[in-house]
């Protein structure tokens, strides 16, 4: 029997639609501890007003710290130690550009992780891998790939920077996008686009998620094992949406909702009434009471960060 057939009263509160995110795998962000991040931040140019402008500024800044060399740095993966070596005349390769750029981005609250790119035949070729950074850009609501060694991004036809996953898909579709270094550093060479694009045959997060929809070879030339914290059989988890929101229900003198985000630098949520346009800011873990005047309540909820509010999610409930 349904509610009407049982002649029951209507519920006081009824949720019709709420923000709901899928669980994500660990992001494996490339971060220093709080002291290390403060030391890195003190070296960096002042952040721009947007996350994209800040990321592009840091891409150029890191690329211009030193000229590329095949020399390797054998210390801890620490941007401050690498930059100290550079100040003393050191020059390094793509691994070190990637470490410094990834840690610099996290120091200014832009989520960033290291990716490793592999060309076809990496199991038998010594020159078949390349290290890059991938960053979540709040104002774009997506991940983008930043190549510190080349001071470059890859861009769609409308100028939007592309992510590692998007570039892997483009590679397998034979669709090479624009290799762009106009806004960045001194190491960029557009003539090398085809060569660098060849490294998108396989993409993994450094010591994190690896994915494939076919067979997988976990060993490079020379027998080096490609470590991963999780090996997935599809790319569905490769680019988690950090604007997504999940919802829990709590009792705060009546029913209330608490919103949650996987964005590591979120500072709260903005709740907007779609009818009155009124807005309310909620701190992290602060509850939104569902009490109020009877009626149809249609709201949006968005994650807020130091750079902007992210893509809003719908919330619809009825109070009686």
Regions found by a protein language model. Give the residues of each.
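Short beta-strand segments within Ig-like beta-sandwich modules, predominantly Fibronectin type-III
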Residues: 276-284
């Amino acid at each position: 029997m349904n509610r009407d057939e049982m002649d029951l009263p209507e519920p006081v509160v009824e949720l019709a639609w709420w923000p709901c995110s899928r669980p994500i795998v660990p992001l494996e962000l490339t971060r220093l501890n709080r002291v290390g991040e403060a030391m890195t931040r003190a070296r960096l140019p002042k952040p721009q007003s947007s996350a994209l402008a800040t990321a592009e500024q840091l891409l150029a800044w890191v690329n211009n710290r030193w000229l590329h060399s095949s020399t390797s740095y054998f210390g801890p993966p620490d941007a401050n130690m690498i930059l100290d070596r550079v100040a003393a005349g050191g020059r390094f390769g793509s691994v070190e550009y990637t470490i410094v750029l990834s840690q610099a981005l996290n120091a200014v609250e832009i989520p960033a992780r290291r990716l490793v790119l592999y060309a076809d035949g990496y199991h038998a070729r010594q020159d078949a891998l390349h290290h890059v950074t991938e960053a979540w850009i709040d104002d774009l609501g997506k991940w983008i790939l930043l190549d510190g060694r080349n001071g470059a991004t890859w861009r769609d036809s409308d100028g939007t920077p592309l992510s590692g996953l998007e570039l892997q898909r483009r590679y397998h579709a034979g669709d090479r996008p624009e290799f762009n270094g106009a806004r960045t550093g001194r190491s960029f060479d557009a003539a090398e686009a085809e060569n660098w694009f060849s490294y998108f045959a396989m993409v993994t997060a450094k010591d994190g998620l690896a994915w494939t929809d076919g067979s997988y070879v976990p060993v490079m030339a020379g027998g080096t094992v490609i470590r991963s914290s999780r090996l997935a059989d599809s790319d569905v988890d490769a680019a988690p949406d950090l604007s997504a929101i999940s919802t829990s229900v709590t009792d705060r003198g009546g029913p209330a909702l608490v919103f949650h985000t996987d964005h590591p630098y979120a500072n709260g949520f903005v709740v907007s009434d779609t009818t009155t346009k009124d807005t309310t800011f909620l701190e992290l873990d602060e509850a939104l009471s569902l009490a109020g005047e009877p009626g149809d309540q249609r709201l949006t909820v968005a994650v807020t960060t130091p750079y902007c509010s992210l893509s809003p999610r719908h919330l619809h409930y009825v109070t009686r």
